[in-house]
Amino acid sequence: MLTQVSATQADSNQASQASQALLDTLYQGHALTRSQSETLFASIVAGDMDPVAMAGMLVALKMRGETTAEITGAADALRSAAKPFPRSADSISTGVLDIVGTGGDGFNTINISTTAAFVAAAAGAKVAKHGNRGVSSKSGSSDLLTHCGIGLTMSPKAASACLDTLGLSFLFAPHYHEGVRHAVPVRQALKTRTIFNILGPLINPAKPEFMLLGVYSPKLLAPIVNVLNALGVKRAMVVYGSGLDEVALHGDTQVAELNNGDIRFYHLTPEELGVERADLNLLTGGEPSDNALITKAILQGKGEAAQRDAVAINAGCALYISGISDSVQAGTKLALATLKTGKAFDVLTQLAEASQTEAQG
Protein backbone atom coordinates (compact mmCIF):
# COMPACT_ATOMS: atom_id res chain seq x y z
CA MET A 1 0.00 0.00 0.00
CA LEU A 2 2.83 2.37 0.95
CA THR A 3 4.58 1.52 -2.30
CA GLN A 4 1.44 2.43 -4.26
CA VAL A 5 1.10 5.75 -2.44
CA SER A 6 4.78 6.51 -3.02
CA ALA A 7 4.44 5.74 -6.72
CA THR A 8 1.38 7.94 -7.00
CA GLN A 9 3.18 10.74 -5.17
CA ALA A 10 6.16 10.39 -7.50
CA ASP A 11 3.93 10.54 -10.58
CA SER A 12 2.22 13.63 -9.19
CA ASN A 13 5.57 15.30 -8.52
CA GLN A 14 6.79 14.51 -12.03
CA ALA A 15 3.60 15.93 -13.56
CA SER A 16 3.94 19.05 -11.43
CA GLN A 17 7.57 19.51 -12.50
CA ALA A 18 6.62 19.03 -16.16
CA SER A 19 3.86 21.62 -15.86
CA GLN A 20 6.21 24.07 -14.15
CA ALA A 21 8.74 23.65 -16.96
CA LEU A 22 6.03 24.49 -19.50
CA LEU A 23 4.95 27.49 -17.44
CA ASP A 24 8.57 28.69 -17.36
CA THR A 25 8.63 28.42 -21.15
CA LEU A 26 5.59 30.70 -21.29
CA TYR A 27 7.04 33.20 -18.81
CA GLN A 28 10.15 33.49 -20.99
CA GLY A 29 7.93 34.61 -23.87
CA HIS A 30 8.16 31.40 -25.87
CA ALA A 31 5.20 29.71 -27.56
CA LEU A 32 3.99 26.24 -26.63
CA THR A 33 3.50 23.39 -29.05
CA ARG A 34 0.03 21.91 -29.49
CA SER A 35 0.84 18.95 -27.23
CA GLN A 36 2.43 21.18 -24.57
CA SER A 37 -0.66 23.39 -24.49
CA GLU A 38 -2.84 20.30 -24.23
CA THR A 39 -0.81 19.13 -21.23
CA LEU A 40 -1.30 22.40 -19.35
CA PHE A 41 -5.01 22.68 -20.08
CA ALA A 42 -5.53 19.02 -19.16
CA SER A 43 -4.04 19.92 -15.78
CA ILE A 44 -6.55 22.78 -15.44
CA VAL A 45 -9.66 20.71 -16.20
CA ALA A 46 -8.43 17.92 -13.93
CA GLY A 47 -8.27 20.43 -11.07
CA ASP A 48 -4.54 19.91 -10.63
CA MET A 49 -3.24 23.41 -11.37
CA ASP A 50 -2.66 25.94 -8.61
CA PRO A 51 -4.90 29.01 -9.11
CA VAL A 52 -1.96 31.44 -8.95
CA ALA A 53 -0.07 29.44 -11.57
CA MET A 54 -3.22 29.32 -13.71
CA ALA A 55 -3.62 33.08 -13.53
CA GLY A 56 0.01 33.58 -14.52
CA MET A 57 -0.36 31.18 -17.43
CA LEU A 58 -3.54 32.82 -18.77
CA VAL A 59 -2.03 36.30 -18.51
CA ALA A 60 1.22 35.19 -20.19
CA LEU A 61 -0.75 33.74 -23.10
CA LYS A 62 -2.89 36.85 -23.38
CA MET A 63 0.00 39.33 -23.29
CA ARG A 64 1.94 37.56 -26.05
CA GLY A 65 -1.12 36.52 -28.01
CA GLU A 66 -2.21 32.88 -28.26
CA THR A 67 -0.89 30.96 -31.26
CA THR A 68 -2.95 28.59 -33.40
CA ALA A 69 -1.08 25.63 -31.86
CA GLU A 70 -1.78 26.83 -28.31
CA ILE A 71 -5.50 27.35 -28.95
CA THR A 72 -5.75 23.98 -30.70
CA GLY A 73 -3.96 22.19 -27.86
CA ALA A 74 -6.26 23.80 -25.29
CA ALA A 75 -9.28 22.70 -27.32
CA ASP A 76 -7.84 19.17 -27.55
CA ALA A 77 -7.61 18.98 -23.76
CA LEU A 78 -11.15 20.21 -23.14
CA ARG A 79 -12.61 17.97 -25.86
CA SER A 80 -10.82 14.92 -24.45
CA ALA A 81 -12.10 15.64 -20.94
CA ALA A 82 -15.70 16.26 -22.06
CA LYS A 83 -18.59 13.90 -21.43
CA PRO A 84 -18.85 11.81 -24.64
CA PHE A 85 -21.63 12.54 -27.14
CA PRO A 86 -22.67 9.45 -29.14
CA ARG A 87 -23.08 9.94 -32.89
CA SER A 88 -25.27 7.60 -34.94
CA ALA A 89 -24.06 6.16 -38.23
CA ASP A 90 -26.57 8.44 -39.96
CA SER A 91 -25.23 11.64 -38.39
CA ILE A 92 -21.66 10.55 -39.10
CA SER A 93 -22.61 9.94 -42.73
CA THR A 94 -24.39 13.25 -43.27
CA GLY A 95 -22.20 15.36 -41.01
CA VAL A 96 -23.24 17.64 -38.16
CA LEU A 97 -23.44 21.43 -38.09
CA ASP A 98 -22.99 23.96 -35.28
CA ILE A 99 -24.03 27.62 -35.44
CA VAL A 100 -22.25 29.40 -32.62
CA GLY A 101 -20.57 32.61 -31.54
CA THR A 102 -17.88 33.54 -29.06
CA GLY A 103 -20.17 36.11 -27.46
CA GLY A 104 -18.53 39.15 -25.97
CA ASP A 105 -19.39 41.47 -28.85
CA GLY A 106 -20.95 43.95 -26.44
CA PHE A 107 -24.35 44.09 -28.14
CA ASN A 108 -27.55 42.86 -26.55
CA THR A 109 -29.20 41.46 -29.68
CA ILE A 110 -31.93 38.88 -30.06
CA ASN A 111 -30.72 35.26 -30.13
CA ILE A 112 -29.85 35.13 -33.82
CA SER A 113 -27.66 32.01 -34.01
CA THR A 114 -29.92 29.93 -31.76
CA THR A 115 -33.01 30.89 -33.74
CA ALA A 116 -31.11 30.19 -36.98
CA ALA A 117 -30.33 26.68 -35.68
CA PHE A 118 -34.05 25.79 -35.70
CA VAL A 119 -34.37 27.11 -39.25
CA ALA A 120 -31.34 25.17 -40.50
CA ALA A 121 -32.68 21.98 -38.90
CA ALA A 122 -36.11 22.48 -40.47
CA ALA A 123 -34.41 22.98 -43.84
CA GLY A 124 -32.58 19.65 -43.66
CA ALA A 125 -29.35 20.14 -41.71
CA LYS A 126 -28.41 18.14 -38.61
CA VAL A 127 -27.56 20.75 -35.98
CA ALA A 128 -25.80 20.00 -32.68
CA LYS A 129 -25.98 23.41 -31.02
CA HIS A 130 -23.37 23.89 -28.32
CA GLY A 131 -24.14 26.79 -26.00
CA ASN A 132 -24.06 28.39 -22.62
CA ARG A 133 -25.61 31.19 -20.62
CA GLY A 134 -25.28 34.81 -21.72
CA VAL A 135 -21.87 36.48 -21.74
CA SER A 136 -22.33 39.96 -23.20
CA SER A 137 -26.10 39.85 -23.57
CA LYS A 138 -28.93 39.33 -21.11
CA SER A 139 -29.96 36.17 -22.92
CA GLY A 140 -27.54 33.43 -23.98
CA SER A 141 -28.68 30.40 -25.98
CA SER A 142 -29.44 28.32 -22.90
CA ASP A 143 -31.32 31.20 -21.25
CA LEU A 144 -33.54 31.43 -24.33
CA LEU A 145 -34.15 27.69 -24.60
CA THR A 146 -35.16 27.44 -20.96
CA HIS A 147 -37.88 30.02 -21.61
CA CYS A 148 -38.98 28.01 -24.65
CA GLY A 149 -39.56 24.97 -22.44
CA ILE A 150 -36.46 23.09 -23.59
CA GLY A 151 -34.53 21.26 -20.87
CA LEU A 152 -30.78 21.79 -20.74
CA THR A 153 -29.63 18.53 -19.15
CA MET A 154 -30.95 15.95 -21.59
CA SER A 155 -28.73 12.85 -21.53
CA PRO A 156 -26.22 12.54 -24.38
CA LYS A 157 -28.08 9.45 -25.66
CA ALA A 158 -31.43 11.28 -25.74
CA ALA A 159 -29.86 14.37 -27.30
CA SER A 160 -28.30 12.22 -30.01
CA ALA A 161 -31.71 10.68 -30.72
CA CYS A 162 -33.18 14.18 -31.13
CA LEU A 163 -30.39 15.01 -33.54
CA ASP A 164 -31.43 12.05 -35.69
CA THR A 165 -35.21 12.46 -35.48
CA LEU A 166 -35.63 16.25 -35.30
CA GLY A 167 -32.40 17.41 -36.91
CA LEU A 168 -31.47 19.39 -33.79
CA SER A 169 -30.07 18.86 -30.33
CA PHE A 170 -28.80 21.31 -27.75
CA LEU A 171 -25.64 20.57 -25.79
CA PHE A 172 -25.41 22.70 -22.65
CA ALA A 173 -21.69 23.37 -22.15
CA PRO A 174 -21.48 22.95 -18.33
CA HIS A 175 -23.31 19.60 -18.63
CA TYR A 176 -20.49 18.26 -20.84
CA HIS A 177 -17.46 20.22 -19.61
CA GLU A 178 -17.53 19.88 -15.84
CA GLY A 179 -13.76 20.37 -15.51
CA VAL A 180 -13.92 23.93 -16.82
CA ARG A 181 -15.38 24.94 -13.45
CA HIS A 182 -11.85 24.82 -12.01
CA ALA A 183 -10.95 27.89 -14.09
CA VAL A 184 -14.01 29.96 -13.12
CA PRO A 185 -12.65 31.62 -9.93
CA VAL A 186 -9.43 32.63 -11.70
CA ARG A 187 -11.28 33.98 -14.73
CA GLN A 188 -13.58 35.98 -12.49
CA ALA A 189 -10.65 37.38 -10.49
CA LEU A 190 -8.73 38.40 -13.64
CA LYS A 191 -11.69 40.40 -15.00
CA THR A 192 -10.29 40.31 -18.53
CA ARG A 193 -10.72 38.19 -21.63
CA THR A 194 -8.54 35.10 -21.78
CA ILE A 195 -8.20 32.12 -24.09
CA PHE A 196 -11.28 30.64 -22.41
CA ASN A 197 -13.43 33.30 -24.11
CA ILE A 198 -12.74 31.72 -27.49
CA LEU A 199 -12.62 28.05 -26.48
CA GLY A 200 -16.39 27.58 -26.04
CA PRO A 201 -17.24 27.32 -29.76
CA LEU A 202 -14.26 25.00 -30.34
CA ILE A 203 -15.17 22.26 -27.86
CA ASN A 204 -18.58 21.01 -29.02
CA PRO A 205 -18.70 17.36 -27.82
CA ALA A 206 -20.47 16.36 -31.05
CA LYS A 207 -17.30 17.37 -32.94
CA PRO A 208 -19.21 18.91 -35.87
CA GLU A 209 -17.89 18.65 -39.40
CA PHE A 210 -19.50 21.97 -40.38
CA MET A 211 -19.48 25.27 -38.48
CA LEU A 212 -20.76 28.82 -38.76
CA LEU A 213 -18.72 30.51 -36.04
CA GLY A 214 -19.00 34.19 -35.13
CA VAL A 215 -16.13 36.03 -33.42
CA TYR A 216 -16.07 39.27 -31.42
CA SER A 217 -13.00 40.71 -33.20
CA PRO A 218 -11.76 40.62 -36.82
CA LYS A 219 -8.32 39.75 -35.42
CA LEU A 220 -9.71 36.31 -34.54
CA LEU A 221 -10.77 35.36 -38.08
CA ALA A 222 -7.43 33.92 -39.22
CA PRO A 223 -6.44 32.20 -35.96
CA ILE A 224 -9.83 30.58 -35.44
CA VAL A 225 -10.24 29.32 -39.01
CA ASN A 226 -6.78 27.75 -38.76
CA VAL A 227 -7.71 26.13 -35.44
CA LEU A 228 -10.87 24.67 -37.00
CA ASN A 229 -8.75 23.24 -39.80
CA ALA A 230 -6.32 21.72 -37.29
CA LEU A 231 -9.24 20.20 -35.33
CA GLY A 232 -10.49 18.42 -38.45
CA VAL A 233 -13.53 20.54 -39.27
CA LYS A 234 -14.34 20.03 -42.97
CA ARG A 235 -16.16 23.24 -43.86
CA ALA A 236 -16.65 26.43 -41.90
CA MET A 237 -17.35 30.12 -42.12
CA VAL A 238 -15.76 32.21 -39.37
CA VAL A 239 -17.52 35.57 -39.43
CA TYR A 240 -17.26 39.06 -37.96
CA GLY A 241 -20.28 41.19 -38.82
CA SER A 242 -19.45 44.87 -38.33
CA GLY A 243 -19.22 44.52 -34.56
CA LEU A 244 -21.34 41.39 -34.15
CA ASP A 245 -20.30 37.76 -33.78
CA GLU A 246 -22.91 36.98 -36.47
CA VAL A 247 -23.46 37.49 -40.19
CA ALA A 248 -24.51 41.16 -40.21
CA LEU A 249 -27.71 42.71 -41.50
CA HIS A 250 -26.60 46.27 -40.67
CA GLY A 251 -23.23 46.23 -42.46
CA ASP A 252 -20.55 44.14 -44.11
CA THR A 253 -19.44 40.76 -42.81
CA GLN A 254 -15.81 39.68 -42.93
CA VAL A 255 -15.51 35.96 -43.65
CA ALA A 256 -12.78 33.36 -43.33
CA GLU A 257 -14.08 30.27 -45.14
CA LEU A 258 -12.61 26.79 -44.70
CA ASN A 259 -13.32 24.21 -47.38
CA ASN A 260 -11.55 20.87 -46.85
CA GLY A 261 -8.22 22.45 -45.96
CA ASP A 262 -8.44 25.45 -48.28
CA ILE A 263 -8.97 28.86 -46.64
CA ARG A 264 -10.10 32.08 -48.29
CA PHE A 265 -11.03 35.50 -46.97
CA TYR A 266 -13.76 37.77 -48.34
CA HIS A 267 -16.59 40.17 -47.47
CA LEU A 268 -20.35 39.72 -47.72
CA THR A 269 -23.01 42.43 -47.79
CA PRO A 270 -26.70 42.03 -46.92
CA GLU A 271 -27.55 42.90 -50.52
CA GLU A 272 -25.33 40.08 -51.83
CA LEU A 273 -27.24 37.71 -49.57
CA GLY A 274 -30.55 38.87 -51.03
CA VAL A 275 -31.94 40.98 -48.18
CA GLU A 276 -32.18 44.67 -47.34
CA ARG A 277 -29.77 46.03 -44.75
CA ALA A 278 -31.38 47.31 -41.57
CA ASP A 279 -30.35 49.30 -38.52
CA LEU A 280 -28.80 47.29 -35.70
CA ASN A 281 -31.25 48.86 -33.25
CA LEU A 282 -34.00 46.78 -34.87
CA LEU A 283 -32.28 43.65 -33.53
CA THR A 284 -32.03 44.76 -29.91
CA GLY A 285 -32.99 41.99 -27.51
CA GLY A 286 -34.34 41.95 -24.00
CA GLU A 287 -34.69 39.53 -21.14
CA PRO A 288 -34.78 35.80 -21.96
CA SER A 289 -38.58 35.80 -21.72
CA ASP A 290 -38.77 38.65 -24.25
CA ASN A 291 -36.34 36.96 -26.62
CA ALA A 292 -38.26 33.69 -26.37
CA LEU A 293 -41.39 35.43 -27.62
CA ILE A 294 -39.40 37.02 -30.47
CA THR A 295 -37.87 33.67 -31.45
CA LYS A 296 -41.26 31.95 -31.45
CA ALA A 297 -42.73 34.70 -33.62
CA ILE A 298 -39.86 34.50 -36.12
CA LEU A 299 -40.08 30.71 -36.35
CA GLN A 300 -43.81 30.94 -37.07
CA GLY A 301 -43.15 33.38 -39.91
CA LYS A 302 -44.55 36.31 -37.92
CA GLY A 303 -41.39 38.16 -36.91
CA GLU A 304 -40.43 41.70 -37.84
CA ALA A 305 -38.71 41.95 -41.24
CA ALA A 306 -35.28 42.81 -39.84
CA GLN A 307 -35.44 40.03 -37.26
CA ARG A 308 -36.53 37.51 -39.89
CA ASP A 309 -33.80 38.57 -42.34
CA ALA A 310 -31.05 38.52 -39.70
CA VAL A 311 -31.96 34.95 -38.80
CA ALA A 312 -32.32 33.94 -42.46
CA ILE A 313 -28.89 35.14 -43.57
CA ASN A 314 -27.22 33.28 -40.70
CA ALA A 315 -29.25 30.12 -41.32
CA GLY A 316 -28.53 30.56 -45.04
CA CYS A 317 -24.77 30.64 -44.55
CA ALA A 318 -25.06 27.58 -42.30
CA LEU A 319 -27.06 25.73 -44.96
CA TYR A 320 -24.35 26.58 -47.50
CA ILE A 321 -21.53 25.39 -45.25
CA SER A 322 -23.32 22.12 -44.46
CA GLY A 323 -23.85 21.40 -48.16
CA ILE A 324 -27.65 21.72 -48.15
CA SER A 325 -27.40 24.74 -50.47
CA ASP A 326 -24.79 25.44 -53.13
CA SER A 327 -24.35 29.14 -52.29
CA VAL A 328 -25.02 31.57 -49.45
CA GLN A 329 -27.66 33.22 -51.62
CA ALA A 330 -29.47 29.93 -52.22
CA GLY A 331 -29.17 29.15 -48.52
CA THR A 332 -30.76 32.46 -47.57
CA LYS A 333 -33.63 31.86 -50.01
CA LEU A 334 -34.21 28.41 -48.54
CA ALA A 335 -34.13 29.82 -45.00
CA LEU A 336 -36.69 32.51 -45.85
CA ALA A 337 -38.94 29.94 -47.51
CA THR A 338 -38.61 27.61 -44.51
CA LEU A 339 -39.62 30.40 -42.12
CA LYS A 340 -42.83 30.95 -44.08
CA THR A 341 -43.86 27.31 -43.59
CA GLY A 342 -43.64 27.33 -39.78
CA LYS A 343 -41.64 24.07 -39.85
CA ALA A 344 -38.89 25.63 -37.74
CA PHE A 345 -41.42 26.30 -34.97
CA ASP A 346 -42.46 22.64 -35.15
CA VAL A 347 -38.84 21.67 -34.45
CA LEU A 348 -38.86 23.90 -31.36
CA THR A 349 -42.08 22.44 -29.96
CA GLN A 350 -40.98 18.86 -30.66
CA LEU A 351 -37.59 19.42 -29.00
CA ALA A 352 -39.34 20.91 -25.96
CA GLU A 353 -41.66 17.89 -25.76
CA ALA A 354 -38.75 15.46 -26.07
CA SER A 355 -36.75 17.17 -23.33
CA GLN A 356 -39.74 17.30 -20.98
CA THR A 357 -40.59 13.66 -21.62
CA GLU A 358 -37.05 12.60 -20.74
CA ALA A 359 -37.05 14.77 -17.61
CA GLN A 360 -40.27 13.10 -16.43
CA GLY A 361 -39.05 9.63 -17.31
From Swiss-Prot:
Pfam families registered for this protein in UniProt: Glycos_trans_3N, Glycos_transf_3
Residues reported in the UniProt entry to bind Mg(2+) 2: D245, E246
InterPro entries from the UniProt entry: Anthranilate_Pribosyl_Tfrase, Glycosyl_Trfase_fam3, Glycosyl_Trfase_fam3_N_dom, Glycosyl_Trfase_fam3_N_dom_sf, Nuc_phospho_transferase
Comment on bound cofactor: Binds 2 magnesium ions per monomer.
Single Gene Ontology MF annotation: magnesium ion binding
Residues binding anthranilate 2, per UniProt: R187
GO biological process per UniProt: L-tryptophan biosynthetic process
Domain of life: Bacteria
One GO CC term on file: cytosol
Pathway assignment: Amino-acid biosynthesis; L-tryptophan biosynthesis; L-tryptophan from chorismate: step 2/5
Residues involved in Mg(2+) 1 binding: S113, E246
Binding site residues for 5-phospho-alpha-D-ribose 1-diphosphate: 101, 104-105, 109, 111-114, 129-137, 141
Binding site for anthranilate 1: G101, N132
Cited function: Catalyzes the transfer of the phosphoribosyl group of 5-phosphorylribose-1-pyrophosphate (PRPP) to anthranilate to yield N-(5'-phosphoribosyl)-anthranilate (PRA).
Family: Belongs to the anthranilate phosphoribosyltransferase family.
UniProt-recorded name of the protein: Anthranilate phosphoribosyltransferase
Source lineage: Bacteria, Pseudomonadati, Pseudomonadota, Gammaproteobacteria, Alteromonadales
Protein encoded by which gene: trpD
